[in-house]
C-alpha cells in the first residue's frame, strides 16, 4: 500500500508519522520524505493487513498536527 502525505514542515514530523504506523504494528517497506518551501511531502509504502487497518492508520495520521492532505496512490 502506498500513501502520500503532505504536512506543513516542522521538527519531529517523521517521528510522529512512524510512531503512528508502529502503534498499529504495521511495517514500513519504504519511506521518501522531502521538504520544499515549508511543505513536507512523505510517500510511504506499507504492509497493510486489511482495509480496516488502513482506515485506523488514516485516523491516526489525521491527528498529527499540520496535516494538509493524505491520499492513497
Predicted regions and their residues:
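A conserved regulatory-domain signal marking ACT and ACT-like small-molecule sensing domains
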Residues: 1-73
Amino acid at each position: 500500500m502506498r500513501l502520500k502525505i503532505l504536512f506543513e514542515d516542522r521538527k519531529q514530523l517523521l517521528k510522529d508519522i512512524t510512531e503512528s504506523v508502529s502503534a498499529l504494528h504495521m511495517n514500513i517497506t519504504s519511506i521518501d520524505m522531502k521538504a520544499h518551501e515549508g511543505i513536507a511531502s512523505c510517500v510511504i509504502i506499507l504492509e497493510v493487513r486489511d482495509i480496516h487497518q488502513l482506515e485506523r492508520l488514516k485516523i491516526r495520521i489525521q491527528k498529527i498536527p499540520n496535516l494538509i492532505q493524505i491520499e492513497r496512490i
